[in-house]
Amino acid sequence: PEPSIVPGPGDEDIGGIEDPTVERLEDGYAVYYTGVLGDHAHGQMFYAEGPSLDRLTKTGVALASSKSEGNTKEATVQRTSDGEWRLFYEYAADDASRVGLATGRSVAGPWTEQPTPFMPREDSWDNWHLSTGPLLMDDPHRPVMFYNGATRDARWRIGWVAFDADCSRVIDRGLMPLVTPPP
């Protein structure tokens, strides 16, 4: 079978497609993905939807990169109890990866950027890079995100951060990583 999302024909994703996130909807699927420009150095988050995963249609940019938040990618989406959606994403700033947050009334947006939900911690295993991961929703009053964190020399680890029920405020964060690479 042919892939349902392919690079091109426009310049905005001709350099490649990566980092898919699939959201099952009542009437089909939504897929967020990173589209890489032809220069292979810049990208942004795109959105596709369709009745099945083999019949997706590209709908355009989900969250554009900006001067302050470059290379938006790696979506984690969650609907909150009030029906609003949260879009966590990775972006580039100051030569590092960060986790951003945007809110929207629909899984397709439009999205309103919010303050950065959590930052690197000085003198810690996650003091430089941060990248989104999946949300564990076993306790809907305390969603937990597993995230990637690293030092400036890119020694990556996996940690966790807990949010309030609406994913709008951090209420706890692990001091030590949950997963570390072998020595």
Residue ranges and their predicted role:
Residues 1-15, 23-127, 137-183:
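Beta-rich carbohydrate-recognition and catalytic domains
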Residues 133-134:
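Functionally critical, mid-to-C-terminal surface segments that flank or help form catalytic/ligand
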